[in-house]
């Protein structure tokens, strides 16, 4: 039976959605209709939200799951009148944390995502700009400033991984696509050799690579299974020969790939 889930917040909804998605992912056999509802920050909005929740309960014949990070007690009480199963994330964790720290929390809306006074903000922006400027081998003369350089065949997940690490952790990650010419030379490009300690390889199953490339250039040599299989085989051989740590990205999310890379390379996050 399909269930409905709401991620409700008086801020952006990022925290409610992130934690809620992580919890729901543990129930793979249950399909969910998921709805994010940010900025529920007034009684009128809360009452309208209750109507949405109750409508979903009537439609589904079972109460929706509600993940909320509402700070205002009055708004939480209005939401609690709905026909939903509420998981109040802040009250679940803040109260015991207040007891342990012997201190009261600020109960500030959107506190963790505030830009003002956040010393990490500029580092995040600089890291994202670095990832964009050094994407796809476009520039190589700034590799000495990189924390990491991801290498692999075209369309194996290098760019989104670099951008995720930049956004989440302030990591300056460049990426370089290994081409057929590199494979024929049976060695790393010279520009990568002098940065060997920063290299990390991404590989991918050929059939998955074929599907991804087909969306970009259908019915081309570039997206053919034979070409994809050849490139993956040669790049994996190069990784082994050059002793480059690597991971197969096929069955992992960007979050998982990033975490595994940082652990493997021992790179410290600039902020957490």
Curated annotation (Swiss-Prot):
The keyword Repressor does not apply. InterPro entries: Kinase-pyrophosphorylase, PSRP. GO terms for molecular function: ADP binding; ATP binding; phosphotransferase activity, phosphate group as acceptor; protein serine/threonine kinase activity. It is an enzyme of class 2 (transferase). Keywords: Kinase, Nucleotide-binding, Serine/threonine-protein kinase, Transferase. Its EC number is 2.7.11.33, 2.7.4.28. It comes from the Bacteria. ADP binds at residues 152-159. PANTHER family: PYRUVATE, PHOSPHATE DIKINASE REGULATORY PROTEIN 1, CHLOROPLASTIC (PTHR31756:SF3). NCBIfam families: PRK05339.1. Bifunctional serine/threonine kinase and phosphorylase involved in the regulation of the phosphoenolpyruvate synthase (PEPS) by catalyzing its phosphorylation/dephosphorylation. Belongs to the pyruvate, phosphate/water dikinase regulatory protein family. PSRP subfamily. This is Putative phosphoenolpyruvate synthase regulatory protein. It comes from Pseudomonas putida (strain ATCC 700007 / DSM 6899 / JCM 31910 / BCRC 17059 / LMG 24140 / F1).
